[in-house]
Amino acid sequence: MKPVKKKKTEEPELEPLCCCEYIDRNGEKNHVAACLCDCQDLDEGCDRWLTCKSLRPETCERITDTISDRLRIPWLRGAKKVNISILPPLVLLPVLLRVASWHFLLGVVVLTSLPMLALWYYYLTHRRKEQTLFFLSLGLFSLGYMYYVFLQEVVPQGHVGPAQLALLTCGLFLILVALYRAKKNPGYLSNPACNDKSPSNSQIECPIKKGQEKTKGFPGTDTSGSLNNRTLKDDAKGSSRVGLDSPAKSKEDWCAKCQLVRPARAWHCRICGICVRRMDHHCVWINSCVGESNHQAFILALSIFLLTSVYGISLTLNTICRDRSLFTALFYCPGVYANYSSALSFTCVWYSVIITAGMAYIFLIQLINISYNVTEREVQQALRQKTGRRLLCGLIVDTGQYNRGFLRNWLQFSTLGTRTVHTPAEDIV
């Protein structure tokens, strides 16, 4: 007799979601209209607040997670989740700048508090090692709002020509293009095919022994430099120095989280949760890492932003403070608070100056690091371990590991992200 085939039990298909329904963090179907229902953590928090009792940190985290999960907008095939961190800049920035334009003292208080609040939020998220769209939202909305104030309050006064407006608009467009390019893949490392899972010596060598062609020659990997007065021949071959140095170094090159062997200068970003080739740092302003593939676009975005910002500041000051130099008008502009339009423009100028000064500092640090062929992660590591050569009170840090001279360092930076032709190790001097 033929064996009777058992019929497979068909799983019931999930019904499509309507525009107001969604799957919550518990895996259950929920509705936007029920966002205020079943809020036990919020009820507990309100009760403890009304009775003057301290709120436990885990309760605050659960309340935040619940709010962020239920904050959604109706959309096709289910309600879409709105990241709550993008909302504060959209609401607070226009309100605070308009309040600051009421009086000189209010402007001092508000413009002093804004950087402090931003730094506090940065250290809060940095300590928790989590991604946030707050700074990206703040940057993009600041660009848009400054441009809006310029069109509404400065251009109608008739002192800005069409060519100047077109040049400023072009600069803003180029900033957005460079930011889009900088937010793309910074050079994430893919996991090589290897079945071994633990970072023992034999298992670390597995990707090289079994699939040397796979791990060999990562695109754009730094292939030259001097370490202890000798050339890194293994870097010239495009592979990590695993299996050739000490076991301690082999374990250092192995990433237990990504289960791969990192090439030279690559590092695991704890915020993004992945390894990045030639990682410089994690930039909160683009909510992404700055690595081998997007470092050039990051520098380009900074340079265009600085030029456009300085140009916009000069146009605004020449309009609201006539017949005065830029530096004098920035600190002494009599009658600027006489009307609302000039007061708001002057407040936005000072806000732009604060942002521009911060970006100029980042740009200066980047130029110094590129000139010495070091990444920001290598600089911080050298400062912690008290290694390398420090100049100008630590502003300049030269590890001496990859420094090949000013021109060669910039030439190497200009070719980041391109697939280079590796020369034999015997030809490298």
From Swiss-Prot:
Bilayer-crossing regions: 82-102, 104-124, 131-151, 160-180, 297-317, 348-368
Membrane topology value: Multi-pass membrane protein
Compositionally biased region (Polar residues): 221-230
PROSITE patterns: DHHC
Record region (Interaction with NOS1): 426-429
Residue segments, region Disordered: 212-247
Major localisation: Golgi
Lumenal face residues: 103, 152-159, 318-347
Record localization: Golgi apparatus membrane; Golgi apparatus, trans-Golgi network membrane
PANTHER family assigned to the protein according to its UniProt record, in alphabetical order: PALMITOYLTRANSFERASE ZDHHC23, ZINC FINGER DHHC DOMAIN CONTAINING PROTEIN
Description of its domains: The DHHC domain is required for palmitoyltransferase activity.
Official protein name in the record: Palmitoyltransferase ZDHHC23
Gene of this entry: Zdhhc23
